[in-house]
């Protein structure tokens, strides 16, 4: 589906929604340091569907090292930061770039200046791996 943007916000219908914390895709609080999460979907159930959320890292924010519970993609929408995977080597990442983590892969994300990312998790996200 193609979306057409207009110059007037009044011309664009906007659907606002929210999920109760018990039914929203939000990681455990102990993983987040100065990171806010805006869930876009309900959690995946038994790997049968995908889940997504916007993560906003404040300057100095960090998603601490942890294993991916299911395959996931982190796509940076704005800002920049650093990511590390199973090898623990930190690499820079910036707006327009994405990283894939396999199920069980240890990883971490941080930002000294602030970063906004879309995180998509689900059994099928690995099919997008390697695409431009």
What are these regions (language model features)?
Residues 1-49, 131-132:
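A short, N-terminal "cap"/entry segment at the start of jelly-roll beta-barrel domains
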Residues 38, 51-68, 103:
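Conserved short histidine dyad/triad with adjacent acidic residue
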Residues 54, 73, 89-91:
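Short, surface-exposed secondary-structure edge patches
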Residues 56-58, 67-83:
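Short, conserved beta-strand element in jelly-roll/cupin
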Residues 63-65, 83-84, 101, 106-112, ...:
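Short beta-strand His + acidic residue motifs that chelate non-heme Fe in jelly-roll/DSBH
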Residues 77-78, 94, 113:
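A cytosolic small-molecule/anion-sensing beta-strand core signal
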Residues 87-104:
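Short acidic-glycine-tyrosine-enriched beta hairpin
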Residues 100, 113-130:
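A short hydrophobic beta-strand segment most commonly corresponding to one strand
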């Amino acid at each position: 589906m193609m979306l057409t943007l207009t110059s007037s916000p009044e011309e664009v219908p906007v659907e606002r929604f929210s999920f109760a914390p018990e039914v929203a895709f939000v990681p455990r609080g102990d993983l987040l340091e100065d990171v806010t999460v805006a869930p876009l979907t309900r959690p995946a159930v038994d790997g049968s569907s995908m889940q997504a959320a916007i993560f906003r890292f404040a300057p100095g924010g960090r998603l601490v090292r942890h294993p991916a519970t299911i395959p996931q993609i982190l796509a940076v929408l704005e800002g920049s930061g650093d990511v590390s995977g199973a090898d623990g080597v930190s690499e820079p990442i910036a707006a327009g770039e994405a990283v894939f983590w396999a199920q069980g892969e240890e990883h971490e994300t941080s930002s000294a200046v602030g970063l906004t990312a879309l995180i998509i998790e689900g059994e099928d996200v690995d099919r997008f791996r390697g695409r431009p």
